[in-house]
From Swiss-Prot:
Residues 1-16 form the signal peptide. Keywords: Signal. The lineage of its organism: Viruses, Viruses incertae sedis, Naldaviricetes, Lefavirales, Baculoviridae. This is Uncharacterized 7.6 kDa protein. It comes from the Viruses.
């Protein structure tokens, strides 16, 4: 009976590990080196503005938290 409980616990832990990924972990190598990079807006010649990264809300919040901690 105890062996069955241990086995079930190990299976649940393995499934949870696959389901819950760390959002701050680097991208998986198979996605390429730009997988985690922010998308760039195109060059706007009329305003003479270079390409700027576009961050999603989670990335902006992370940057705010990091700036607050510094």
């Amino acid at each position: 009976m105890k062996l069955l409980l241990v086995l079930i616990t190990l299976i649940i832990a393995a499934l949870a590990n696959n389901a819950l990924r760390d959002p701050l972990a680097p991208p998986v190598r198979r996605f390429g080196h730009l997988a985690g990079a922010p998308k760039l807006r195109g060059h706007d010649a009329s305003r003479n503005v270079a390409a700027q990264p576009v961050y999603n809300a989670a990335e902006e919040r992370l940057q705010q938290c990091r700036a607050h901690l510094d």
